[in-house]
Regions:
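Extracellular S/T/G-rich loop segment that most often corresponds to the catalytic His/Ser-adjacent loop
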Residues: 108, 129, 296-386
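C-terminal subdomain of the subtilisin-like protease fold in secreted/lumenal serine endopeptidases
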Residues: 80-82, 227, 236-238, 307-310, ...
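Substrate-binding/access-modulating region of protease and related hydrolase catalytic domains
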Residues: 32-44, 63, 98-99, 169, ...
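Active-site core segment of subtilase-fold serine proteases
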Residues: 62-194, 202-213, 217, 224, ...
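Repeated loop/turn-to-beta-strand initiation elements of outer-membrane beta-barrel proteins
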Residues: 571-575, 614-622, 642-649, 654-657, ...
Length: 821
């Protein structure tokens, strides 16, 4: 036989039925070498007649979308496999992944197609030796080149066992529990994937007995099988076989060709692991199985292009199987573990595997077997790759990403005890014992790394897209519902449907910070030096905050001095200044900041007002204010009388730094800014000479440059009362800072994925109103103590800060005492 022969990586145990597994029993040898065992077989009981097939489930909605909770798929036949629950496969099914449209080549001993669990499955077969002579054996076990004879079958059914792990049809309807107790059948991990079962065992090898018992594979046969799979355009190749590493690179080169063709190649690591010991003669024997066998050992080499993986086995307690070859150093980053001990799959009829056994059932259907070996770990990984490629079409263009996802999301395998095969400890991270760890589909089907939305022409993080804007727009992004169901991408560019409400709730609290004024700055101004002079109709006042003496920072800039100047003339007044702001009739809350365009500008801003009396006792004010990034210009008309005053105005304002005190356009790749035209009405009433009532309201039409918005209107209002009390005056203010009351934004958003994995975008319209309404309450008492000493005590409460419903209330208190110097 040309080339070193490879063997099946398996030992199997028969089960009585799919519902009643054999608790104890002897091993039935299926393949020679690679850890196969020999002995008598336990015969299955006659299974109950199969139930009528359930009605097909309704077609799932287009992916990505959750069609049911994972628990809905954890049916009897799911759990009967033993392996699927160990890797969390139900998480893949929950979002509609089935393997549909993915073709997996199983290079093995062939597969039957009429097993009860293959009815409806897409399984095609090909035999590389059916019409072309292959290296093989005659009836005496001597080497011969021949085509396969019709009676040359693998009575162990190794290829059928492997195929069942991948593609056994799901019978349970996840939408109902009616059939969950049906006592027959299992399901494959990728139960809607198609399988190309390529038979490549050497003709006559499966019929050998004695020391050479079991199916064997010549390198040349395997090469032909791989080349055939490449020619057929399969997506994944599963090779549940292997042997000793030799110097002939023919087989390895064929695997590399498959990888270069864009095919993912999944190979059993081997079943040769044996700890060091002594032989029958008492001689010391070194441990074996420290590395994957041939051809799995090439996983991880550069020529494999990240598309070849070696698969080891774990038992039902998630411990590495004694027989499983370890990862070794060269392949450890491409060595993954999956269930391979005590799992249940489809097999040949017991009359073929155990002919003449009186306990065999009377039918000629296939049966179910409990099996062990890395032969069955590999198809779990092959099926998992099919699920990923089905669910995330973008991975088809870069199939190595699908494999990388499984490697990156594997559960790290840590065992503090030195491994009996390698003598090393399976520590944190990839290691020579367990490679990257145990496959975890629940994690593999979760978004990984940075998660982004392709909005308009920009790609922004979910946190940035859904973060509350603050200012007038609050939490519009999550409140609008427009982001629900959009498609976001993870670091592998996979698409997922967005649950915007849940994502927004998971964002860190306090992203917008506190709106309480800076108490240090307020204290500095309370302790400021103030001067004022007046000469005739001209007055001038200035205020300089105190300098903080900090020995750790002795060279501080001098504080900015604010000033106010006024000149009165017949019928009018001119007033200008820096800092503070234009006086208003409407009351304001002093202990909370109103970001953006408020009543006043920062201490660095300048302002001016011209007042002129017109007819009917009315006064017209023209005013303007500027700061580095904000400007305000307007006109108002009002009247000041003894007991009452009012003012109506219109103003134009712009802010080049924020969207009305928040951040909105930035998530669309534009600069936060705003322009608005505001209409205001404010008044003051002093009905009894002592009680003063004042209020103000504003409605504004808003434009947000850089984005497509329509009909944005905001509101803002305040009411207050002041009354003398003892040696001072008590004031109470209730105010709502500027809030968006109407308006929409239209933007291009990712709404779907096509069958090539390309993001599909369409226009989405979202409301800009926030979920809550911030109301601020403030009480102030300003009083005289004695002489020139004065005091102030204030307390304020803000409910639904930043107009976000359910956000925690904020409160603050202030007390100051001062005197003239």
């Amino acid at each position: 036989v040309a080339g070193y022969e490879k063997n099946c990586m398996t030992s199997i145990r028969l089960v009585l039925t799919a519902a009643l597994l054999v608790p104890t029993g002897l091993m039935l040898g299926a393949c020679a070498g690679g850890g196969g065992g020999g002995g008598s077989a336990v015969t299955p009981l006659s299974p109950p007649p199969p139930p009528p097939p359930p009605p097909p489930p309704p077609p799932p909605p287009p992916f990505p979308a959750t069609i049911a909770q994972p628990s809905a798929f954890e049916t009897r036949e799911y759990n009967a496999t033993v392996g699927l629950p160990l890797i969390g496969a139900s998480s893949a099914y929950a979002i509609g992944a089935t393997g549909q449209g993915i073709r997996v080549a199983v290079i093995d001993t062939g597969s039957i197609t009429d097993h009860p669990d293959f009815i409806g499955a897409s399984i095609t077969t090909f035999d590389v030796c059916a019409s072309t002579a292959c290296p093989g054996y005659d009836v005496t076990g001597d080497s011969i080149t021949q085509i396969r004879q019709s009676d040359d079958i693998d009575t162990g059914g190794h290829g059928t066992l492997v195929t069942g792990v991948i593609a056994a049809v799901r019978q349970d309807d996840f939408t109902t529990s009616v059939d969950d107790t049906v006592a027959n059948g299992i399901q494959g991990i990728a139960y809607e994937a198609s399988v190309l079962a390529i038979r490549a065992d050497s003709p006559g090898s499966c019929a050998r007995t004695g020391q050479d018992e079991g199916c064997a594979f010549a390198d040349s046969n395997l090469v032909r099988a791989i080349d055939y799979a490449i020619a057929q355009g399969v997506t994944i190749i599963n090779m549940s076989l292997g042997g000793e590493i030799d110097s002939d690179p023919t087989l390895e080169n064929a695997v590399r060709r498959a990888a270069q063709a864009g095919i993912l190649v999944v190979i059993s690591a081997g079943n040769e692991a044996e700890p060091a010991g002594t032989d029958d003669m008492g001689n010391s024997v070194d441990a074996v199985g420290q590395t994957p066998s041939e051809p799995a050992y090439i996983a991880g080499e550069a020529a494999s292009l990240g598309r070849v993986v070696a698969v080891g086995s774990i038992d039902t307690s998630r411990k590495i199987s004694d027989f499983s070859n370890r990862a070794g150093n060269a392949a450890m980053n491409y060595y993954l573990m999956a269930p391979g001990e005590g799992v249940v799959t489809t097999g040949l009829d017991d009359n073929i595997t155990n002919p003449g056994d009186p306990t065999n059932d009377l039918d000629s259907d296939g049966d179910y077997y409990r099996v062990s070996g890395t032969s069955f770990s590999a198809p779990y990984v092959a099926g998992a790759l099919a699920l990923l490629l089905d669910a995330f079409p973008n991975l088809k263009n870069n199939p190595e990403l699908a494999l990388q996802i499984l490697l990156d999301t594997a559960d790290d395998y840590v065992d503090a005890s030195p491994d009996l095969i390698t003598g090393e400890v399976a520590g944190a991270g990839a290691d020579s014992v367990s490679g990257v760890g145990i496959m975890n589909l629940a994690e593999a089907f979760r978004p990984q790394g940075q998660q982004t939305l392709s909005i308009s022409i920009d790609r922004v993080s979910l946190g940035e897209a859904l973060a509350p804007s603050g200012g007038a727009f609050g939490d519009w992004a999550s409140n609008s519902g427009a982001f629900n169901g959009l498609v976001f991408q993870d670091k592998y560019d996979r698409g997922f449907r967005l649950d915007a409400e849940a994502t927004a709730k998971s964002l860190p609290k306090g992203l917008l910070g506190s709106r309480v004024v800076d108490m240090n700055t307020r204290a500095d101004w309370a302790a400021s030096q103030s001067r004022a002079i007046a000469v005739g109709d001209l007055s001038f006042a200035w205020f300089t905050p105190r300098v903080q003496e900090d020995r750790l920072a002795p060279y501080q800039a001098e504080p900015v001095t604010n000033f106010q100047a006024a000149y009165s003339f017949s019928g009018g007044e001119v007033e200008f200044g820096r800092g503070g702001g234009i006086s208003r009739l409407a009351p304001v809350v002093t202990l909370f900041n109103e970001p953006g365009i408020g009543n006043a500008f920062s201490t660095s801003g300048s302002w001016a007002r011209v007042s002129h009396e017109i007819e009917f006792g009315l006064t017209m004010d023209l005013f303007t204010a500027t700061e580095e990034t904000r400007s305000l210009t307007g006109v108002s008309v009002g009247r000041d009388a003894r007991f009452w005053s009012f003012r109506a105005g219109i103003s134009s304002a712009s802010d080049e730094e924020t969207a009305l005190g928040g951040s909105l356009q930035n998530r669309f790749g534009e600069t936060d800014q705003a322009a608005m035209t505001a209409y205001s009405l404010e008044g003051e009433w002093n009905p009894f000479g002592r009680l003063t009532l004042n209020s103000g309201m504003e409605m504004a039409s808003v434009d947000l440059p850089g984005v497509d918005t329509q009909d944005i209107w905001t509101s803002r209002w305040s009411v207050g009362a002041t009354h003398p009390a003892g040696p001072g005056a008590l004031s109470f203010v209730v105010a709502q800072p500027r809030r968006a009351e109407a308006g929409t934004i239209r933007f291009l958003a990712p709404t779907g994925i096509d069958d090539r994995g390309e993001i599909l975008q369409s226009d989405v319209e979202a409301g800009l109103t926030p979920s809550g309404r911030q109301i601020d309450y403030e009480t102030r008492y300003r009083f005289t103590l004695f002489g020139d000493w004065t005091g102030e005590a204030s307390a304020a409460l803000s409910t639904s800060p930043n107009h976000i419903s359910g956000s925690g209330d904020e409160s603050v208190a202030w007390f100051a005492v001062g005197t003239k110097w």
